[in-house]
Amino acid sequence: MSFSNVLIMRQPDEGKCHICKRVFCCGKCRQKHQFKAHAIAVREPLGLRSAGGGIIEHRHQMESGATTIYVFCPICERRPLLLREEMHGELLAHIETCHLPLRCRKCQRNYTRVDDLREFSKCVDQQQSCTDVTGATETSKATLKKAANSTAISTQTSPSVTPISLINMRWKAKSRVTHEEFISDSVSSIRNLSSFSNSSIRRSIGQLGVNPSETMEKGKVIRSTSTPLHVESVFAKPKEPITFNASTGGHVSSIYHEEPSPTPESNPVQQQQQQQQPLQQRAWKMGARNKMSAATPLRQVMSKSIQKAFVEHGGMMVHQPPSAVVQRRVRLDLSEHSSHEAAGSSALDLRLSPAMRRTQSESSASEVNSGSSSSYSTSRNADLCKRQFLLSAQKLTTESIIITRTNSSSQKTSSTVYNSCESVEIIRSTSESAEVCHVPAITPIRVTGAGINKKQIKFETPPKSSQQMRSNGEGDETKDQFFTPEPGTPEIPERRHRQAIVPRQLSGEFSPKKDKPKEKGLAVMALISPPLQQPRVRPPLRECRQQRVYSGVQDVGEPEVVDAEEEDEVFRPTNASTCNDKKLEAPNSGRLWSLMSSMMRLPASLRGEREKDRDRDRDSDKENAGSGSLIRRCASIAGSLVRPSARDSSMEDQQCLKRKRTQTLDSQYCSPLSPSSSSKRYRIRPREPIERMRRQ
């Protein structure tokens, strides 16, 4: 900040010109500047007071000794011009030259001539006189901005009263009254009016409109504050129906809204008690709504389950009798003598889920009287029978789910009715045919058309005795019933559909010496004969060491006679699609390709022996002559593809040691159309150069 700016800030207002805002060194220099540049010399003084008119006459004594009267234009000084009957001619000439046209702030009248300023009339706005005129011209720099069309009072007529816009005040007060009538008991609304009642608001509005002078003395300013004022806790207010407006749906009722009674007629004794009940209310009940709203406001954050509970719990207000409107209030007195007076149900408890309500009502009783209207009017025993409608927050169904449970306790009978829709006719039709019946506790009934709740689905595991009976063949009629199996129950062999795994070995040189012609015969029979449909039991792993070891998946054959002790272990692939494809393919083509792939995988040392065994089996099998020719043709093709190579014993031992690493239980399934990866490695094995030159 520079030094010159500091000097300007420290200078008082007496060094600044009031019109052009120029700054001078002192007040005398500023006064000389104003009288020389901005003052209007007046010939005849009018004797106007400075407090009354706003135009101040300044007497300036010249150096020659003569006294001159000067007047400053209020418009140039950015002050309102008050029109009077007597005005200086020099001032009017200055206004005509510099400031015309003018517009009144109150009545928005335009003054375009000086004669209009002389022959003016009082502008009347809401019975208040206004003679303020401001300038709005573009030729002068000292003109004021055009005032907006507002109703604000320009000047403060009294130091004790704040200027208030009367129209805005009326509109705000009227809107508050209308708003209070509609949502007076809303859960999410809090009144911010500081007035004591609606009548005081209307009285203050009337006083403001009729006589403003009396309003300044007697009327009270209505204002809204940011702090909630609980006026109703001190002063009693009339009872009003409770509504709930903090939801998106139109059918949502209040928490304390009660179910309408299905019987339109009521006991006359109860009507008399209901008429006397408002007189017996205590004074502290008046502030019940404010206390409850402070506890749970329940705005727009309600879950869908709570909204459904509101829809099920509260009915429409149209179906209620006039006597039930008085009952829709906040009941803070929950004593026993006043609870049975109401014809509806108790308040909905949102803390309990439907499962908890069913658990708590295990020991409750059900009694539905067929002549409900006659019993209400004739006997007083209906007061002892309290009907509680516990409404579940489940999905709405097309029918009514009514579950009755019976229990007698202290000569009082209460019924629990689970009602999922507002169907009074179904309840009436059920109540006419139903009597007091003792039924054991049951699970909620599955109604046609109702959505299944995930929490209601219950899986049960059958006992072991039923499983043993089913295994013996006694439970054939219940095969379609499925249950969740127990983890400790042993599995039944007939239900096992798991396919086993084939122990794979590349060659049969390291397998134990067995009857190889018999093995080859079984392999050929498995390729020709159709496969068996019955799955077999997998033996324990300890017995696998005593079984045969085969060179490939396709070389394994299944015997025709199945014996649990003597049959060879064959592990099938676990993929169901491959099993189905294997069954659906043609017998000759599938066997042909499987035989070709098996022959291509066989080592060269066993090829000649396998050809002899296949020729011997072909002679012994007369009915399968066609397939035998295919086998012989396939063997010739495989012999042309797999070329024998002369190896010494050292090379064979080294190859055997290398092949031992691939002996494993492989769970993957090899397609018969493509050879395995191990056979590919054997075929692409490089040959010695001397053998290659000899064959070429």
UniProtKB/Swiss-Prot annotation:
Q: Which UniProt keywords apply?
A: Cell cycle, Cell division, Cytoplasm, Mitosis, Nucleus, Phosphoprotein
Nuclear localization signal: where is this motif? 512-520, 534-538
Q: Which GO terms describe its cellular component?
A: cytoplasm; nuclear envelope; nuclear lamina; nucleoplasm
Ranges annotated as biased composition (Acidic residues): 557-569
Q: Which spans does this entry mark as compositional bias, Basic and acidic residues?
A: 607-624, 685-696
* UniProt-listed GO biological process terms: cell division; chromatin organization; chromosome condensation; DNA replication; mitotic cell cycle; nucleus organization; pronuclear fusion
> For the region Disordered, what residue ranges are annotated?
245-285, 336-379, 457-492, 555-586, 603-696
Please give the residue positions where the record annotates the modification Phosphothreonine: T478, T484, T489
User: Where in or outside the cell?
Assistant: Nucleus envelope; Nucleus, Nucleoplasm; Cytoplasm
- Segments carrying the region annotation (Rich in charged AA) are 448-696
Compositional bias (Low complexity) = 270-281, 361-379
Predominant cellular place of this UniProt entry's protein: nucleus
Tree of life domain: Eukaryota
Q: What does this protein do?
A: Cell cycle-dependent nuclear envelope component required for embryonic mitosis.
Q: What else is known?
A: The OPA repeat-containing and the Ser/Thr-rich regions might be involved in protein-protein interactions with the major protein-rich layer of the nuclear envelope.
Q: What is the recorded name of this protein?
A: Mitosis initiation protein fs(1)Ya
Q: Which organism is it from?
A: Drosophila melanogaster
